[in-house]
């Protein structure tokens, strides 16, 4: 290898070292599977919602209840970007599981925050120039970590 070729190769290696790699695991799919596993491990019955079901990702029920639709929102690092419409009307009573994978910060296990949308409606943050979207910070949902009892 020539000196010029070695310099080019070292430039490529240095560039790769400089760039931080993001996880190649799609957060949405990972979150849904993790929530499903957590629910089954806690004694719930659960199934993935069909492709035509809008507004929810899983159906969950305990032994004596009817199926309850839940939304799963997953990120590698907070905040979660959400629609304002998720917190009003019929969706206000829906339960959302916010999943924080934490891959970029070397967190070894995901964190689950289980909350009814209406409880976060007043904490939803929306920049002045945004109309339909806003975000939920990790501090807003900390109180609801592992709040699986809400689904019983």
What positions do the PLM features span?
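Mixed-charge (Asp/Glu-Lys/Arg
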Residues: 1-54, 59-152
């Amino acid at each position: 290898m020539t000196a010029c070729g070695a310099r080019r190769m070292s430039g490529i290696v240095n560039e790769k070292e400089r760039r931080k790699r993001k996880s190649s695991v799609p957060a949405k799919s990972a979150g849904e599977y993790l929530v499903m596993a957590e629910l089954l491990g806690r004694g719930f019955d659960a199934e993935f919602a069909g492709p035509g079901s809008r507004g929810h990702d899983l159906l969950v029920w305990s032994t004596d209840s009817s199926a309850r639709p839940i939304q799963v929102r997953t990120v590698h690092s907070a905040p979660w970007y959400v629609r304002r419409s998720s917190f009003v009307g019929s969706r206000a009573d829906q339960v959302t599981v916010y999943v924080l994978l934490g891959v970029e910060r070397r967190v070894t296990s995901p964190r689950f925050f289980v909350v009814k949308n209406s409880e976060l409606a007043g904490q939803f943050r929306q920049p002045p120039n945004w109309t339909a979207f806003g975000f939920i910070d990790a501090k807003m949902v900390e109180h609801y970590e592992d709040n699986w009892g809400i689904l019983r």
